[in-house]
A protein has these predicted regions:
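Short beta-strand-centered aromatic/proline hotspots
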Residues: 76-95
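Hydrophobic beta-strand residues in large extracellular and virion-surface proteins
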Residues: 67-69, 88, 100
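Short, solvent-exposed secondary-structure boundary/capping segments
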Residues: 96-104
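Intrinsically disordered, low-complexity, charged/polar segments
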Residues: 106-204
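Mixed-charge, Lys/Arg-rich low-complexity intrinsically disordered regions
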Residues: 2-67
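Generic structural motif
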Residues: 72-74, 93, 106
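N-terminal intrinsically disordered, low-complexity, charge/repeat-rich segments that act as generic
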Residues: 1-28, 178-204
């Protein structure tokens, strides 16, 4: 079981107030607001979690689960920028890698909006270890509103993963979206987010 040590205090406080993770829009907003105050959390801290899995995609992976890991792109010299710590929801796997949505390419509020839209594909509303989003590229294209997923859609190579994968517990999804865990190289996050905006607005 993924240990929820970073968010445990927030989870306990929320439950005491009657908020159940993921159960309602009000509940999700409360947990996001509390998590947004954790501005000093570093991605390296998550890498120390118990229960991290090996750094290769395997049959224990399922689309619609959320992971944090460290990545070093193969052709980074030719990329305009990249994120060294993707926060990725898995979409599909390949023999040499995998594809997913890296939420870091959107600012926190837009990450939350994208996640809200994808909740329509939840396999259950328990937000427990078995909860995942029944996600596919075809389903992403059916989401209402602007295609926020487009700048987030990335493909990764197994051999370029530089850490174990940390699976994010579903009860934490709404909170971790608010944290500044991205580590962009070559551009500041604000510039990356501006580029992403031009993509989902159809101007690039």
């Amino acid at each position: 079981m993924t240990k929820r040590f970073i968010f445990q205090q927030i989870l306990d406080q929320g439950i005491d107030r009657g908020f159940i993770p993921g159960k309602s829009e009000e509940s999700r907003a409360w947990f996001r607001e509390q998590a947004s105050k954790l501005s000093t959390i570093r991605p390296e801290r998550f890498m120390k979690r118990q229960g991290a899995i090996r750094n290769q995609v395997s049959n224990i992976w399922r689309p619609g689960e959320l992971y944090l890991f460290r990545y070093d792109p193969l052709h980074k010299e030719t990329l305009p920028y990249y994120d060294r710590f993707p926060l990725m929801m898995l979409i599909d796997t390949y023999t040499d890698g995998f594809m997913g949505l890296n939420f870091h390419y959107l600012p926190p509020l837009m990450r939350a909006l994208l996640m809200e839209r994808m909740y329509r594909f939840l396999n259950n509303e328990n937000f427990d270890e078995k909860t995942r989003i029944l996600l596919s590229y075809q389903k992403l294209k059916t989401l209402s509103g602007r295609p926020l997923y487009k700048p987030c859609l990335k493909r990764y190579l197994n051999n370029q993963v530089m850490s174990r994968f940390v699976k994010i517990h579903p009860a934490e999804w709404d909170m971790i979206l608010m944290l500044p865990l991205d580590r962009f190289v070559k551009k500041r996050r604000s510039a990356v987010w501006r580029d992403s905006k031009t993509i989902y607005q159809g101007r690039k």
